Structure formats: C-alpha cells, structure tokens
Amino acid sequence: MIQMQTNLDVADNSGARRVMCIKVLGGSKRKYASIGDIIVVSIKEAIPRGRVKKGDVMKAVVVRTAKDIRRPDGSVIRFDTNAAVLIDNKKEPIGTRIFGPVPRELRAKNHMKIISLAPEVL
C-alpha cells in the first residue's frame, strides 16, 4: 500500500537509490498503489554518474510492498521493503538490471520486460 509521501527503494540500476511517491496514477481520487501500479516519484537519493539525478520527477512501477498481498489460492506474499522500478513514458524500464525478487502479479499488469529482467519471480 503505497501512498503520497511514501519512501521506496529503487530495484534497478538506473542510478537512483531512494525515491518518494508524489502521485498515484489511475483516477483523480485514488489514494493507494499496490504491486504493478504506476506512480509518479521524485528522486531523493542517487549515485554519481547515474542515468537519473536527485530532484528528477519520473514514473515508476511498484514491484515490492511491505503490505501483504492475497492471491486467489489463499496464499499471502509480503516483502521486507517497498521497492519500485523506474520507467519511461513507453513503460519500459530505464535500468538494464532488476535487483531482488518480483511477484508474478506484474505479469497480469503487462510489465513483461520487468519480469524478464528479474532474477527471481515469486
């Protein structure tokens, strides 16, 4: 459950380390984002010589949340941290690598490129 002002880790090699959610996309009254949703983020911490720099405003896909997600078979999946992957306007990842596991719920939201780059799909 990601809302405005939530800090997230960045799970790719785009150069950003921490981002903050500044908007949840998908309707004017939408308050929360979950896994696979697109949010607008501000880069709060970045490494030198990265593809992005501190202060940039970008779009991102939420790939991990600390709030548990119920699956249709009754199982529950949750992660230790909130994490996102930065994307461009064509919904393609900016980075070339994804760090950490991602859930298979991303497949239903048509984020196939993130699924293919991820080292593990849960």
Curated annotation (Swiss-Prot):
GO terms for cellular component: cytosolic large ribosomal subunit. InterPro entries: Ribosomal_uL14, Ribosomal_uL14_bac-type, Ribosomal_uL14_CS, Ribosomal_uL14_sf. It holds the Pfam family Ribosomal_L14. PROSITE patterns: RIBOSOMAL_L14. GO terms for biological process: translation. Keywords: Ribonucleoprotein, Ribosomal protein, RNA-binding, rRNA-binding. The keyword Ribosomal protein applies. Transmembrane segments: none annotated. Belongs to the universal ribosomal protein uL14 family. This is Large ribosomal subunit protein uL14. It comes from Sinorhizobium fredii (strain NBRC 101917 / NGR234).
